[in-house]
């Protein structure tokens, strides 16, 4: 692997860049080639790969079976909130209010408008004003409730939109 300035190339045994775009499994590692010439990210950041969110590490490999903060990545290197059920609910919600031709920001705006239009039930007494961040296990619970019932309180709305934004590749905290 040749790296410079947060990008690089996977090189084969002849020293040539492995060309093509998309995911590349090479020597037991996985890389994301984002250009046809084979360029990879090596920047320690979130990226979109089709409909999936990935995290490229500083060495150019995808983070697999690991986590960065509340961002968990499976064995394939794809983002998961940690619940297959909620992951599917988020994907279905995004698909229900977006179209394939939309940009990432257009998808975020469409999802925001759709979440905002869900029924509001009033304040949940689960937390007081001193709580700044929803604990991750409760985040999943709150998101699941609004995705399955179509209604919720401020915590449900926040949890749902946070997970939607993450699935679209944005850094988001609730």
Regions of interest found by a model, annotated:
Residues 9, 31-32, 71, 112, ...:
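Aromatic side chains
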